[in-house]
Regions:
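Conserved acidic catalytic loop of the alpha/beta-hydrolase fold
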Residues: 142-150, 157-177
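Conserved hydrolase catalytic core segment
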Residues: 174-213
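Alpha/beta-hydrolase-fold enzymes
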Residues: 198-283
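Conserved alpha/beta-hydrolase "acid-adjacent" motif
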Residues: 325-334
Length: 380
């Protein structure tokens, strides 16, 4: 990388966290301690970021958060990668008055499966996403206007290379692990084949080593957006966006992800559950750029790590939810067989749950000890 490309602007204020509990040491009988507080939103910017396609982003920013502290030798870092429609806010709160902590707060923190008393955890917003990283809604510094639908095509390799650039900027040169659910699991697998010497292990959760769907599915998504009168060929920004279309899409997604089952105890009637799912869908629909959905979906359908399994040097923990409709347990035997044939040290764990694709946070107690033991075993 050129000296100019290494020029980066990083907000270096560390995320403060309360350290109120001691690690349990054996990965069993875990109790989720209180949430961390005062998590700080941070950004990293570099210049002249070259994509796999040969195109270059003149300026590339990643939004990120950190939990815990980096050891003096820089070798205690864990990268946590997020799902496709979620954000980098994986643990803690920005303010004590926030209604809820980050999505994996039950798993990340002092004494938890990913123990911030031991590890420096980095969670960055995916390149192309809608939560602060360079994406279609960003201003192109060359034109002074949003990229919009003209945003360059990116690959899963580009996504993890951007993360690697961030980590280098933070002083991290080798990871203990890359851990992530769903789209984050795609990234974990991609890390293991793109940069096999950069981590001791990966935990790929409710995911697969290859993308689902085809290019036609990307076009079908665009066609669906095009039915909204505000779409305007993707230039929807000055027309108020397409929140109604995105709300409907989000409701479908949350339902498919298992939210009916998750909400059943608190909301016993279907009408109440439907109302709660809509309540959760509407804010997301106002902030997520549909062009980001297209960009990330295209990267996903073109993604495939299986052909490069022979490159993997990291240990692998592969986790699937028994009731997941997106990545059902039926895919696991083939994945594990291919990993074994490639000589990969891999372990499989199935979460026994009715909560489908959304099980990992709410069912933390069922698989958190396995994750904790795996991560801590990487340091031995």
């Amino acid at each position: 990388m050129t000296p100019r490309a290494l020029l980066a602007v990083v907000t270096l204020s560390l995320a403060a966290c309360t350290v109120a509990s001691k690690p349990d040491g054996n990965g069993s009988a875990m109790v989720a301690p209180d949430s961390m507080e005062s998590v700080v939103k941070r950004t990293f910017t570099t210049y002249g970021f070259r994509l796999q396609s040969g195109q270059t982003l003149p300026e590339m920013t990643l939004a990120f958060e950190t939990y815990g502290r980096l050891a003096p030798d820089g070798r205690n870092a864990i990268l946590v990668t997020h799902g496709g429609t979620s954000s980098q806010h994986m643990a803690g709160k920005y303010s004590p008055t926030d209604p809820a902590p980050g999505g994996w707060d039950t798993l990340i923190g002092p004494g938890k499966a990913i123990d911030t008393n031991k590890y420096f955890v980095v969670s960055s917003n995916v390149l192309g996403s809608s939560y602060g990283s360079t994406a279609p809604a960003s201003i192109n510094p060359v034109t002074g206007k949003r990229y919009g639908p003209d945003f360059p095509e990116i690959s899963m390799h580009d996504i993890v290379t951007a993360q690697r650039t961030l980590l280098r900027g933070l002083g991290v040169h080798r990871l203990v692990a890359v851990v992530g659910p769903s789209y984050g699991g795609y990234q974990a697998f991609q890390w293991s084949v793109s940069y096999p010497d950069d981590m001791a292990g990966i935990a790929a959760v409710i995911t697969a080593p290859k993308g689902s769907g085809k290019e036609a599915d990307v076009q079908a998504l665009v066609d669906r957006f095009a039915k909204d009168p505000n779409w305007n060929g993707g230039w929807h920004y000055d027309r108020g966006g397409i929140p109604d279309t995105l709300t409907t899409l989000r409701i479908e997604t949350l339902t498919r992800y298992g939210y009916n089952e998750i909400l059943a105890e608190k909301f016993p009637t279907q009408a109440d559950r439907d109302a709660e799912i809509r309540r959760r869908a509407e804010p997301w629909a106002k902030e997520f750029d549909p062009n980001s959905m297209v960009t990330m979906r295209r990267a996903a359908v073109r993604y495939g790590a299986e052909k490069d399994f022979s490159k993997i040097r990291a240990r692998v923990l592969y986790v699937i939810s028994r009731s997941d409709k997106l990545f059902p347990p039926s895919i696991a035997p083939d994945v594990m067989d291919k990993l074994a044939k490639a000589g990969v040290d891999a372990k499989y764990f199935q979460i026994d749950t009715e909560f489908g694709h959304s099980a990992t946070g709410v069912e933390w107690a069922k698989w958190g000890p396995t994750l904790k033991a795996f991560v801590e075993g990487l340091s031995q």
